[in-house]
């Protein structure tokens, strides 16, 4: 018996309605966007009306809209969150991405719930629990290797969502309390102050400086574009691009880049199918390196490697363009193959190791002119973090998404009939009364030409069949009107045919407690329980002791960050993977102004823990 192809989803970010529409245009199968409140990016909230408009637009292409409501909630916020969830459901949202298990205990509409990466999903046991209590998709921790992802997929059936591109949190998501402890701005409340991107000095127990003023907790950006097929074969169903604060150019370029890569795989792998309908065409060639990035890493893909960090800068480095060749006044030449343009932004690392940038004033042949001579020297690598010509292309309409449609034009006893059938099987038929008369010229070619004029619509004619009993005269005006009506009806039919997935409530029922036990018996502050309903959820699933969230009851001398990034390893002193021993005395500390952080190395679990020093 032939298996149904597995649905594969490209999931793009949107900070607002404009970004969301462009994500759809450029090939996203689904878009995730912030709720009006309670999203993990406090600066990326959206109105209900904008979310409604985005849902209407996406559903035309059978694409889905997931709304992020993935912060932990205070007791007094639960009623407002419940009301908002109903409003989001009525606006057309396809699913909610949540962190707080208290949400599962509210009076909810039948909207699917996705378990955010903030729920710390890194073991088969945790993912299986979420599956069994009713979550319909689970976002895995970014830190998981291919083998770990495969193991989870083999032991569960819930669709798995993984990040493939974008900024990396240095800590396990949902397990970072550094910002909350140092500033009162909690990452679990959507207000991360990004202490991980600051410059720190590394100091040993005797106060000796090992490294001075580097961004020692700053990671490169993830890029797993070359590994998509391996992820699909491991059991992943949703490929996620990070970036709910990124601008529309970023969303356009990165979405298109992954769409093209994914389409090439789907074209030769019939066991997988695209999750939405339509196809996109572009006015530009997508290049991931041309959008904001701190340098790329596949990030712990198969084994630990040294390529994950961005110690020199947390800013966008850009694409390599070559090295400085010859300097002359306010001009220079480059040894490299990239074509530079007037207005390009270039970056370089100065003699202090700091990132600097300058704007290209003009380019003449192979010589680049600047207004002021930057502090560059021969053989220095240069990068381009702003491509003027590329940005111009993206600032205009840069993609069209079309649904393939087949059209058939026939005569009947009363006039003419037009039928339209799109690629998903949606079909309409309309009849136009008309007093027929024989034509002097053949009409078939003009009928095909006029009916194919679908430019400003979501459709593209891939076939127009003319089947008339005689060569009747058909005015172009009549064809235009029938085409207009046909498009309107087909759009309406598609909207009516679209069916949202509905889910059963994620609630413990009588007798269900022991059947679906939570993998842990005791929850510390790491459980992020900030309201009574979340506590009730865990207790109903066999948890016997539940501590308050860090945000409710700040602790001293507890780990504030758990990270796979290890400074011992970065320095070459890892006792597991490296032979060299450190000449410095532990514990090590990170120092930034008045902030002092203590490091502890948990080699058994291959992670680094960070504490605040008083």
What residue ranges belong to the model's regions?
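Short, glycine/polar-rich helix-capping loops at beta-to-alpha or helix-loop-helix junctions
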Residues: 122-126
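An active-site metal/cofactor-coordinating segment within enzyme catalytic domains
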Residues: 43-47
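Surface-exposed amphipathic alpha-helical tracts and adjacent flexible/coil segments at the periphery
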Residues: 1-26, 30-40, 50, 54-55, ...
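Short, conserved active-site loop motifs that form the nucleotide-linked donor/cofactor pocket
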Residues: 94
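Short active-site loop/helix that positions an aromatic residue
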Residues: 104-109
């Amino acid at each position: 018996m032939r298996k149904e192809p597995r649905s594969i989803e490209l999931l793009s970010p949107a900070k607002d309605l404009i970004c969301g529409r462009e994500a759809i245009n450029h090939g996203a199968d689904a878009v995730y966007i912030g709720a009006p409140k309670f999203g993990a990016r406090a600066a990326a909230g959206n109105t209900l009306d904008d979310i409604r408009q985005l849902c209407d637009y996406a559903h035309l292409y059978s694409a889905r809209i997931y709304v992020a409501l993935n912060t932990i909630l205070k007791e007094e916020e639960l009623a407002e969150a419940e009301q908002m969830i109903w409003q989001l459901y009525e606006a057309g949202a396809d699913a909610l991405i949540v962190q707080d298990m208290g949400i599962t205990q509210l009076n909810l509409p039948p909207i699917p719930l996705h378990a955010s990466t903030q729920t710390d999903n890194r073991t088969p046991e945790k993912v299986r629990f979420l599956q069994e209590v009713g979550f319909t998709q689970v976002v895995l921790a970014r830190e998981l290797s291919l083998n770990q992802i495969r193991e989870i997929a083999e032991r569960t059936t819930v669709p798995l969502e993984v990040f493939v591109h974008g900024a990396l949190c240095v800590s396990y998501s949902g397990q970072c309390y550094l910002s909350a402890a140092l500033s009162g701005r909690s990452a679990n409340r959507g207000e991360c102050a990004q202490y991980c991107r600051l410059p720190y000095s590394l100091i040993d127990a005797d106060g000796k400086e090992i490294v001075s003023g580097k961004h020692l907790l700053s990671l490169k950006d993830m890029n797993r574009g070359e590994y998509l097929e391996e992820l699909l074969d491991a059991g992943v169903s949703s490929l996620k691009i990070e970036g709910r604060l990124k601008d529309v150019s970023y969303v356009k370029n990165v979405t298109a880049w992954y769409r093209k890569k994914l389409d090439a795989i789907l074209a030769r792998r019939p066991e997988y199918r695209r999750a939405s309908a339509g196809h996109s065409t572009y006015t530009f060639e997508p290049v991931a390196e041309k959008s904001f990035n701190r340098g790329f890493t596949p990030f712990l893909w198969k084994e630990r490697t040294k390529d994950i960090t961005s110690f020199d800068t947390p800013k966008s480095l850009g694409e390599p363009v070559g090295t400085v060749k010859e300097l002359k006044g306010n001009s220079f030449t480059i040894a490299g193959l990239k074509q530079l343009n007037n207005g390009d932004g270039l970056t370089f690392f100065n003699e202090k190791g700091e990132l600097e940038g300058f704007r290209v004033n003009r380019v003449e042949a192979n010589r680049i002119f600047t207004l002021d001579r930057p502090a560059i020297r021969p053989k220095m690598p240069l990068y381009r973090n702003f491509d003027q010509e590329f940005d111009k292309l993206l600032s205009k309409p840069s993609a069209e998404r079309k649904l393939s449609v087949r059209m058939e034009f026939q005569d009947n006893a009363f006039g003419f009939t037009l039928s339209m059938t799109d690629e998903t099987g949606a079909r309409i038929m309309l009849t136009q009364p008309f007093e027929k008369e024989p034509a002097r010229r053949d009409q078939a070619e003009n009928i095909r030409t006029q009916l194919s004029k679908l430019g400003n619509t979501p459709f593209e004619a891939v076939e127009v069949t003319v089947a008339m009993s005689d060569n009747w005269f058909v005015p172009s005006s009549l064809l235009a009107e029938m085409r207009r009506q046909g498009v309107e009806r087909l759009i309406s039919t598609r909207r009516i045919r679209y069916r949202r997935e509905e889910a059963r409530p994620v609630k413990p029922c009588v007798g269900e407690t022991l059947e679906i036990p939570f993998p842990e018996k005791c929850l510390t502050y790491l459980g992020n329980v900030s309201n009574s309903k979340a506590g009730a959820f865990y207790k109903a699933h066999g948890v016997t002791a539940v501590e308050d969230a860090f945000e409710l009851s700040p602790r001293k001398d507890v780990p504030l960050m758990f990270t796979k990034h290890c400074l011992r390893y970065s320095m070459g002193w890892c006792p597991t993977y490296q032979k060299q021993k450190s000449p410095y005395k532990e514990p090590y500390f990170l120092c930034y102004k008045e902030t002092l952080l203590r490091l502890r190395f948990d080699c058994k679990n291959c992670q680094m823990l960070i504490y605040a020093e008083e």
